[in-house]
C-alpha cells in the first residue's frame, strides 16, 4: 500500500480550501460572539458512555471506539459536539440562568452520510441553555439564518417541523406508543402503505391523525389545515402555535412546514428546523430544541441550538478567501526588517521571496511590492 493513501472518505484540506474554511469559521464565531455566545472547546476524545448519552442507535453506530491504554476503558472519538456542550453546561458551568455557548471543532464518523461526504467534519454551532420559551428558539433560528447569509448564501429554504406533534399522538394511545419506532420510520420515509398497515387497528382519532401527517406539508398555510385534521390537544396546539411564530419570524427566506419530517425525533423535544439551498440535496444546517440533552449529566435544562459542517459550507459558499499580499525581497537589512514588521503589525500579509524563488507565489495575490526608494522602504502597486 502506498504510504500517501488516506482512508476512504477522509481527505487532506489544501491551502485554498483551508483558507476559506478559516475565513468562514472566523466570520461565524465573531457573529456568535456579537449575540453574546461564549466559546467552549470540548476534547475530541472522551469515555464512550459520556458521548452516547443522547442520539440513540445512530450516534452509537457513527462513533469510533478504541481502548484507553491508561485505564482500559472504552473511549470514543466524538461524532457530535452537542452532548459535550450539554455536559459542560450541566456539570462544569452549573449556572442558574440563561447560558449561551458556541463551539467549532472536528467530529469523526465511522460511515459517511452520503456517497461523497467526508467522515471528518468541522462542526460549528451555537446553543442556548436555561430558557424553555420560544424566544430562545427564535434567536437560534435567526442566528442560523444570519450565519448562512454571512457566508454569502441566498435563496435559502427553511424547513420547520415539531417533535411534539407525534409525541402527543403517541402519549394518548398506548398501542401506538408500542409501535413508536416503526411509526417514526414510516412517517420519516413517507411510506404510506406501511403507515396504513401500522395504524389499521388503532383508535379512529389516532389513526386519522397519523395518516394525515404525511400530507401536512407546504407553506405556512398548512398549519390551518393541521388544526382541523389533528386532535385538539394542548401539546399539538402549542406545537402548531410555535411553528406559526417561527415561520412568521423567518424573514427573507422561503418557509416550508412538514409535520412528517421527523429526522432527529429521538433527539429533539420541540421545534426542529433545517436550512436548504438550491442544488444541494442535504440540509446545510440543522437545529431545534432538545430539552432532555443534559439529563444524563444530572441536570436537565431547557436547550435549543443549531450546527453545520464548515467544510460543506465552504464548498458551496461564494465567499472569496484568496488574500492579497505585499511582495518583499529577502535581505539582512534592519530597515527592511522594520518595514516588514510594521506592515505585519498593521494586519498586512507580507511575503518575503526567498532567493531564487521570486515567482513561486501561487496561493496569494501579491498586488503590491515593498521597494526601496531614496533610502526608504515603501509599498507600491505591482
Swiss-Prot record:
One of its GO terms (molecular function) is histidine-tRNA ligase activity. GO terms for cellular component: cytoplasm. Pathway: Amino-acid biosynthesis; L-histidine biosynthesis; L-histidine from 5-phospho-alpha-D-ribose 1-diphosphate: step 1/9. CDD domains: HisRS-like_core. It is found in: Cytoplasm. Keywords: Amino-acid biosynthesis, Cytoplasm, Histidine biosynthesis. NCBIfam families: hisZ_biosyn_reg, PRK12292.1-1, PRK12421.1. Heteromultimer composed of HisG and HisZ subunits. PANTHER family: HISTIDINE--TRNA LIGASE, MITOCHONDRIAL-RELATED, HISTIDYL-TRNA SYNTHETASE. Belongs to the class-II aminoacyl-tRNA synthetase family. HisZ subfamily. This is ATP phosphoribosyltransferase regulatory subunit. It comes from Burkholderia cenocepacia (strain HI2424). The lineage of its organism: Bacteria, Pseudomonadati, Pseudomonadota, Betaproteobacteria, Burkholderiales. The gene is hisZ.
Amino acid at each position: 500500500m502506498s504510504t500517501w493513501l488516506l482512508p476512504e472518505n477522509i481527505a487532506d484540506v489544501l491551502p485554498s480550501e483551508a483558507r476559506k474554511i478559516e475565513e468562514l469559521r472566523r466570520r461565524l464565531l465573531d457573529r456568535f460572539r456579537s449575540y453574546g455566545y461564549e466559546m467552549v472547546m470540548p476534547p475530541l476524545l472522551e469515555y464512550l458512555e459520556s458521548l452516547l448519552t443522547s442520539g440513540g442507535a445512530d450516534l452509537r453506530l457513527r462513533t469510533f471506539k478504541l481502548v484507553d491504554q491508561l485505564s482500559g476503558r472504552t473511549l470514543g472519538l466524538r461524532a457530535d459536539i452537542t452532548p459535550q456542550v450539554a455536559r459542560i453546561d450541566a456539570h462544569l458551568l452549573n449556572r442558574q440562568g440563561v447560558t449561551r455557548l458556541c463551539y467549532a471543532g472536528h467530529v469523526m464518523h465511522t460511515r459517511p452520510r452520503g456517497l461523497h461526504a467526508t467522515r471528518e467534519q468541522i462542526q460549528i454551532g451555537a446553543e442556548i441553555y436555561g430558557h424553555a420559551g420560544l424566544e430562545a428558539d427564535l434567536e437560534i433560528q435567526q442566528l442560523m439564518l444570519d450565519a448562512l447569509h454571512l457566508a454569502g448564501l441566498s435563496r435559502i429554504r427553511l424547513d420547520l417541523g415539531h417533535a411534539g406533534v407525534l409525541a402527543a399522538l403517541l402519549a394518548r394511545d398506548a398501542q401506538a406508543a408500542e409501535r413508536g419506532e416503526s411509526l417514526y420510520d414510516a412517517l420519516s420515509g413517507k411510506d404510506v402503505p406501511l403507515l396504513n398497515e401500522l395504524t389499521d387497528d388503532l383508535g379512529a382519532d389516532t389513526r386519522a391523525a397519523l395518516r394525515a401527517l404525511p400530507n401536512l406539508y407546504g407553506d405556512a398555510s398548512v398549519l390551518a389545515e393541521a388544526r382541523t385534521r389533528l386532535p385538539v390537544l394542548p401539546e399539538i396546539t402549542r406545537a402548531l402555535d410555535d411553528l406559526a411564530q417561527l415561520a412568521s419570524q423567518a424573514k427573507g427566506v422561503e418557509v416550508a412546514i412538514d409535520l412528517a419530517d421527523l429526522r432527529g425525533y429521538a433527539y429533539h423535544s420541540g421545534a426542529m428546523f433545517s436550512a436548504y439551498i438550491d442544488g444541494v440535496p442535504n440540509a446545510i444546517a440543522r437545529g431545534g430544541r432538545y430539552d432532555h440533552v443534559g439529563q444524563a449529566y444530572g441536570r436537565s435544562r431547557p436547550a435549543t441550538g443549531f450546527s453545520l459542517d464548515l467544510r460543506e459550507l465552504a464548498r458551496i459558499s461564494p465567499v472569496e478567501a484568496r488574500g492579497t499580499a505585499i511582495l518583499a525581497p529577502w535581505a539582512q537589512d534592519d530597515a527592511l526588517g522594520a518595514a516588514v514588521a510594521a506592515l505585519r503589525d498593521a494586519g498586512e500579509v507580507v511575503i518575503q521571496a526567498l532567493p531564487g524563488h521570486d515567482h513561486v507565489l501561487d496561493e496569494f495575490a501579491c498586488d503590491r511590492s515593498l521597494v526601496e526608494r531614496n533610502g526608504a522602504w515603501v509599498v507600491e502597486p505591482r
